[in-house]
Amino acid sequence: MSVDSEPKPASPDARAGTTAGVLPLIFIGVLLAILTAVALLSLTAGDTGLVNVYGLTVTRVLAEIGSVLTVGSLLFAAFMVAPKKSGVLEVGAYAALRTASWAAVLWFFAALVSVVFNEADAINKPVGEVLRSDLLFTLIGELEQPKAWLVTAFIALVVAAASRFAVSWGWTATLFALALFGTLPVPVTGHSSAGGQHDLATNSLLFHLVAVSLWVGGLVALLVFGRRVTTGPELRLAATRFSATALVCWIVMAASGVINAWVRLPVSDLFTTSYGLLVVAKIAALVVLGGFGYLQRKKGVQAITDGGTSGALVRLAAVEIVVMFLTIGIAAALSRTPPPGVGEVPDAVALQLGYTLDGAPTLLRLLTAWRFDIIFGTLAIALAVLYLLGVRRLKARGDAWPVGRTIAWLLGCLTIVIATSSGFGRYAPGMFSIHMETHMMLSMLAPVFLVLGGAVTLALRALPVAGKDGPPGPREWLLAIVRSPVSRFLTHPVVALVLFVGSFYVLYFSGLFDVALDKHWAHLLMNAHFLLVGYIFYWPVIGIDPAPRRLPHLARLGMVFASLPFHAFFGVILMSMTTIIGERFYQGLGLSWANDLLGDQQLGGGIAWAAGELPLVIVLIALLIQWARADEREAKRQDRKADTEGDTEREAYNAMLRDLSERS
């Protein structure tokens, strides 16, 4: 008779052996990525500036490898293994955190050197000439890519320094989010950010790069640090979580890669241009990686789940890592190769917005001229689907969930889609008045519906509880975010109010809006800011979910009324201004049906002044209903207390009378 037993932790020799085997593999992968990028560029680069081209390519490969290793190590430390009950990282997670620090150092230096190479490449000058002159600092202010590399270098430096001191789960998760954000500045200012359809190209590329960072970095971290944890439950947990992450990443990479190639490359150029051949090579590598991912799930992860052995995982991942780094090399060469037709200049509207605007924004066009926003449209759909799955899980176990909350959440998601993907989203970058309408929808309407949906409460009820001895999961991570000092600070009434109303004045009256108008990534940040700040403001006011700060209903009402004059004054200022905000950008578009820029701005001011009325009505109704229900619950509680304990005040009074009667 056999007895199942818990697998024993790997011995130090076994762990060292695994690490010693993986590190040379990583070195070979890095070298292969560099050689691949250089070799492919030798087929496509011209005769001038080869040192700059190759230098920038090599430093870009090193920066990307440093970034994915940083992200992957932090992913492993924060989410693949459980911390101690005190919140301090376990040994394997701590080792991953320290490795992230060193990887971020590589990322920092490679990004910093890329600033110089990028400037030299942009003006076709030797690197030495750029360093010896005052061009180095002058070009940073004039060129987008050097600025992006400098921002990336700064983020990498912060992550490298902070990772040396962090020991808790909270700080590790924060550094993971920061590192992931640090991978974005460079790609949003590259090929995908210019020319026709650059909005679709940029949005899909952001998804693509995040997925690459999580998949490649996560796999390397799992191999290097997984054995430091144990071959028992912790390793199984890490392998299972990474397997699920890898599957999602592969789907995202495939979908976003197809979209990016589709907007950049006609099918006829797929096999007849250098850019097309590089795309084909990258697609082939992605298919191979998908095959290895499938084998990992079927053999490697399954073997760990069944018996705790990681041999199959290591063998498959070894080849997978090599292919991954080869793909990074192809991607680096692709980023340095102009797509076909890059010399063709589209009209001013398509050049600035990525698409054309066919006539004035009539009501019919606003409702029918859709252009799906890959980021916010996908986000809204994902939020709606996850919410409905949570409701279905509750109903499957017999728990009720109010229909009104579901309707509110779906209306919030629909508002996001309409604001970013309908004709409103299409015309918003080209007209100030339409932009203000989307601004109001994202900051004052969608958040109202979302906070009334109570998604956090739904998630806490639907997600499994880790238990006393179980590893923290999504439910515990969500609770940590809600209870974090950052959430408590942001939901302070004064802070929330200042963020909500102050953002209007800072963005439009400081010159930031003028600077941001011709940058697609800036529009993405504005939309995200509007939505997030609106949610932060309305959450403690009418939110169903428990906020870090529970305010009395009178204080909530005060927050709402305190914001009204600031919104009204903002709209009045816009309507009375004679200076046109973003005048040069809007004039450059040359829209024949939008010549009256001042009138359009005044219309936008009127929208800002009046648009708060409908959300205000919804907020006041919701707040008064919640107030009445809270009073009703309190009255019922007092009644139950009286029924169970008796009317203590009346009994005390009667006892006093009896006592007086006896004395007399």
Mark where each language-model region is.
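Polytopic transmembrane helical bundles with strong interfacial aromatic enrichment
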Residues: S2-F372, L598-L603, I607, L614, ...
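Secretory/periplasmic and organellar redox-cofactor proteins
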Residues: E476-R488, D596-G599, A642-L660
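Functional transmembrane alpha-helices
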Residues: G66, V188-S193, Q197-R227, N260, ...
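Juxtamembrane non-transmembrane "cap" segments at the membrane-aqueous interface
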Residues: V342-A350, H567-L591
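Hydrophobic, lipid-facing residues on alpha-helical transmembrane segments of integral membrane proteins
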Residues: A104, F108, L247-A254, M441, ...
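Aromatic-anchored segments of alpha-helical transmembrane domains
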Residues: A111, L180-V188, A255, C413-S421, ...
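Early transmembrane hairpin module of multi-pass membrane proteins
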Residues: Y54, R60-V61, V68, A111-N118, ...
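Juxtamembrane membrane-water interface segments of multi-pass membrane proteins
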Residues: S11-R15, A77-L97, V220-R241, W262-F271, ...
